[in-house]
Curated annotation (Swiss-Prot):
It comes from the Bacteria. It comes from Anaeromyxobacter sp. (strain K). GO terms for biological process: base-excision repair. Residues 201-210 have a biased composition (Basic residues). Residues 181-196 have a biased composition (Low complexity). This is Putative 3-methyladenine DNA glycosylase. Its EC number is 3.2.2.-. HAMAP family: 3MGH. Belongs to the DNA glycosylase MPG family. Signal peptide: none annotated. GO terms for molecular function: alkylbase DNA N-glycosylase activity; DNA binding. CDD domains: AAG.
């Protein structure tokens, strides 16, 4: 079942977490391409310095100011498309970036990372930007809540955003091999599980014998 518009018409951070485990589907020329979402990032409101909406409703970001449940697809580095879903109430610019997914069906490429994911599902700005996710070509299917724990951390590559870069608005399924970067908190978790290093053996004074 497709997610209804009401699913997206909530706080961006709530939607970013709730999308984990759901299935992104693109019907491309009659071919079904699908992947299970394992990593997202929330971009919340006009004050978020990491968001495209910080500059107002520019031609690129205008979709973020529109109704929830639309696809916001843009190009980075001139070659890679990124797929977002518009969230929250209309007029409050916010969206969730789908960073990575687990391939299920018809994927053409690795689905690890937002550019790879769009290539794998053949999602393109010129065809899919602004699409209503309640339609028949590009949508998100409901799925049971994931069994994996959800971990959070700072968003990727937004160092320019000052204090906003530290907001823990990246969400990922712990242990998924399809996450684009090590899952937030993974290094700390590994360190916590690692056995403590043995204490250094004290040196004996020279000539003290065995």
């Amino acid at each position: 079942m497709k997610l209804p518009q009401a699913f997206y018409a909530r706080d961006t951070r709530t939607v970013a977490r709730a999308l984990l485990g759901k299935v992104l589907v693109h019907l491309d020329g009659g071919v079904r391409r699908a992947a299970r979402i394992v990593e997202t990032e929330a971009y919340h409101g006009p004050d978020d310095r990491a968001s495209h909406a910080r500059a107002g409703p520019t031609p690129r970001a205008a979709i973020m100011f529109g109704p929830p449940g639309r696809a916001y697809v843009y190009l980075i580095y001139g070659t890679s498309h990124c797929m977002n879903v518009v969230t929250g109430p209309e007029g409050f610019p916010s969206a969730v970036l789908i960073r990575a997914a687990e391939p299920i069906e018809g994927c053409l490429h690795s689905t690890r990372g937002p550019g790879n994911l769009c290539r794998a599902l053949a999602i393109r700005r010129e065809h899919d930007n602004g699409r209503d996710l309640g339609g028949d070509d590009l949508f998100v299917e409901d799925a049971p809540p994931p069994a994996e724990a959800v971990v959070t951390g700072p968003r990727v590559n937004v160092g320019y955003a000052g204090a906003w870069a530290a907001r823990p608005w990246r969400f990922a399924l712990r242990g998924s091999p399809w996450v684009s970067r090590p899952a937030p908190g993974a290094a700390a978790a590994r360190a916590a599980r690692a056995p403590a290093a043995p204490a250094p053996r004290p040196r004996r004074p020279r000539g003290s014998g065995p």
